[in-house]
């Protein structure tokens, strides 16, 4: 974890006396995950979020997102002088089928929303944005100008795959307090959220942690040092606290949650960006979940001074250019797993890879001899 600057002592609790095998979260219910889905909370906080549109997805479109491979609808190319030359035309014999014929209404809604929002949008599903797939984008961010830009990001993202395949991992039904794998998860109404593209300043986005409707702590989201944030810390904390007290504290469905805000210049308005589950799957960023879970509640309704963590200038781990964010998602899973298991695991993987290459070379030589 990067070194942080903390001007106020955290409301820490005593360290646990026995070794824990898992973080002491309360049971995460199916309903809590659904309450953190964009389609659930956005209508209630419509005036607090950037301009966006949620498109209800049909079963054929969800099936398309889940399918292996990336097949994009054809895009009309501008006419050229070569269009009149039919010498080498194959009449489209090798063209892939158009997947959008199975969901034309979704395709048209996406295109019309892009036009309505000035030609640029950023996509997400119920919980996640495809931030891990920006390496597939020509702009190296989640900015999308066409429907195919959106499909490419969604189908290239592990985060989106998790929304589709594992939204209820480690969850329990609302009628039990223990892990019950036999319970049937509820059906999920999937939505594609298209937000009007705004060039966000990542230094001004903050993550805030709420337990029992008390704002415990907050921190910057981008893990780089920003010197200008330090003189602003008290005023930013005050604005976030006021925003929470007036807009979220008594209105969000659950008492425990994590929310993200954005406070652009002139820093007098707080925008709600996302609401996340109070669960280990949510990145605790500059805190550890263990210290958050062991923070003490205020006594007798005494006001709590939430800790606001920022990254210091002299933190060598704070400069993200050394390790690009989501870099692990750009590699095959086998490579990531091998690197996690240490030098031995990577050596074993490289040995297997060399064997595969050698076998392919032998097969290629055999094919050449047969010709």
Swiss-Prot record:
Binding sites annotated in the UniProt record for ATP: 124, 127, 129, 131, 195-196, 205, 207, 221, 260, 274, 276
Binding sites annotated in the UniProt record for Mg(2+): 274, 276
Location of this chain's protein in the cell: Cytoplasm
Listed Pfam families: D123
Positions of the UniProt region annotated as Disordered: 73-101
GO MF annotation: an example: ATP binding
Keywords for the protein's UniProt record, in alphabetical order: ATP-binding, Chaperone, Cytoplasm, Magnesium, Metal-binding, Nucleotide-binding
Gene Ontology cellular-component annotations: cytoplasm
Main localization category: cytoplasm
GO BP terms, alphabetized: eukaryotic translation initiation factor 2 complex assembly
InterPro entries linked to this entry: CDC123
Biased composition (Acidic residues): 80-99
Superkingdom of this protein's organism: Eukaryota
Family designation: Belongs to the CDC123 family.
Function: ATP-dependent protein-folding chaperone for the eIF2 complex. Binds to the gamma subunit of the eIF2 complex which allows the subunit to assemble with the alpha and beta subunits.
Protein name: Translation initiation factor eIF2 assembly protein
Source organism (scientific name): Aspergillus niger (strain ATCC MYA-4892 / CBS 513.88 / FGSC A1513)
């Amino acid at each position: 974890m990067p070194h942080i600057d903390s001007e106020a002592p955290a409301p820490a609790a005593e360290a646990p006396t026995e070794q824990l095998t898992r973080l002491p979260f309360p049971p995460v219910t199916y309903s809590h995950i659904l309450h953190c889905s964009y389609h659930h909370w956005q209508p209630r906080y419509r005036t607090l979020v950037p301009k966006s549109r949620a498109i209800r997805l049909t079963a054929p479109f969800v099936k398309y997102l889940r399918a292996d491979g990336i097949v994009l609808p054809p895009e009309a190319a501008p006419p050229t002088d070569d269009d009149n030359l039919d010498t080498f035309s194959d009449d489209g014999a090798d063209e892939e089928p158009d997947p959008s014929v199975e969901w034309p209404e979704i395709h048209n809604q996406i295109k019309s929303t892009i036009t309505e929002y000035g030609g640029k949008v950023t996509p997400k599903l119920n919980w996640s944005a495809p931030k891990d797939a920006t390496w597939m984008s020509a702009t190296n961010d989640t900015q999308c100008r066409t429907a195919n830009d959106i499909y490419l990001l969604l189908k290239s993202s592990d985060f989106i795959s998790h929304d589709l395949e594992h939204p209820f991992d480690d969850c329990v039904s609302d009628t039990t307090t223990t892990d019950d794998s036999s319970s049937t998860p509820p059906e999920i109404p999937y939505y594609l959220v298209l937000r009007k593209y705004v060039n966000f300043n990542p230094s001004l986005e903050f993550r805030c942690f709420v337990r029992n409707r008390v704002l415990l702590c907050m921190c910057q989201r981008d893990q780089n040092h920003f010197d200008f944030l330090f003189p602003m810390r008290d005023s930013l904390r005050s604005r976030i606290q006021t925003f929470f007290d007036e807009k979220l504290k008594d209105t969000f469905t659950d008492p425990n949650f994590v929310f993200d805000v954005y406070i652009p210049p002139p820093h007098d308005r707080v925008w709600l960006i996302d609401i996340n589950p109070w669960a280990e799957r949510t990145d605790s960023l500059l805190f550890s979940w263990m210290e958050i879970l062991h923070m003490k509640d205020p006594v007798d309704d005494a006001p709590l001074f939430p800790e606001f963590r920022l990254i210091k200038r002299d933190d060598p781990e704070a400069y993200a250019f050394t390790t690009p964010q989501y870099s692990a998602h750009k590699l095959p899973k086998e490579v990531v797993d091998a690197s996690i298991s240490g030098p031995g695991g990577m050596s074993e993987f490289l040995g297997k890879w060399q064997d595969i290459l050698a076998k392919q070379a032998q097969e290629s030589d055999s094919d050449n001899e047969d010709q």
